[in-house]
């Protein structure tokens, strides 16, 4: 893989955790810093080894939260497996640092990270979860199909439109993440109204 020019790898950062981390299916990580102001620590997750187990993951999410992954297509698999892998890393690191001694918050951004939020919520409910959306997936689809989103917002039902526009899986995941998150946020008043109508939870 082509190296990221903004990532500076380190063999000493978090080395004690990395040395003992037992991640599933031979999952690999790289640890370093982003080469930006503040130089934050970052863990890059290689999630390719989890692809053969995606149906097991989707079955768990259906049984626990009713997330319907059967009609999924496009970028759904990649997003879900990445976010699950990231949640597994959070879980591993939390246990290593004995996270119960701290107030830990895990922030998940957009539907693409929703499955990670749901995994953390199930395995480590003591971690506070924050879910942010910049626009709902079904709202984007409504507008992208040439339908007037905001002019008739009050008349739309998110679940119904997801069926009509073949967005069931993404909408199902996003709606579940929004409802299960300890704190649900968005970026504007108009998007908050969109969330209230289409996801049936008003942002906090």
Q: Predicted regions span which residues?
A:
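Catalytic cores of nucleotide-sugar-dependent glycosyltransferases that transfer UDP/GDP/TDP-activated
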Residues: 1-204
């Amino acid at each position: 893989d082509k190296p990221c020019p903004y990532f500076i790898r380190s063999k000493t950062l978090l080395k004690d955790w990395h040395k003992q981390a037992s991640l599933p299916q031979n999952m690999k990580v790289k640890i370093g810093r982003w080469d930006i102001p503040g130089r934050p620590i970052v863990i890059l997750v290689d999630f390719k080894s989890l692809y053969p187990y995606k149906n097991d993951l989707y079955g768990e999410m259906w049984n626990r939260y009713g997330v319907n992954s059967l009609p999924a297509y496009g970028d759904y698999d990649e997003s879900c497996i990445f976010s699950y892998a990231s949640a597994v890393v959070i879980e591993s690191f939390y246990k290593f640092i004995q996270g119960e001694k701290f107030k830990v918050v895990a922030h998940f951004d957009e539907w693409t990270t929703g499955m990670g939020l749901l995994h953390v919520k199930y395995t480590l409910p003591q971690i506070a979860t924050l879910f942010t959306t910049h626009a709902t997936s079904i709202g984007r689809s409504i507008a992208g199909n040439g339908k007037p989103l905001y002019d008739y917002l009050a008349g739309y039902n998110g679940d119904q439109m997801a069926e009509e526009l073949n967005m069931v899986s993404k909408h199902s995941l996003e709606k579940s993440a929004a409802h299960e998150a300890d704190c649900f946020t968005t970026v504007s008043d108009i998007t908050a109204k969109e969330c209230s109508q289409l996801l049936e939870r008003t942002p906090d």
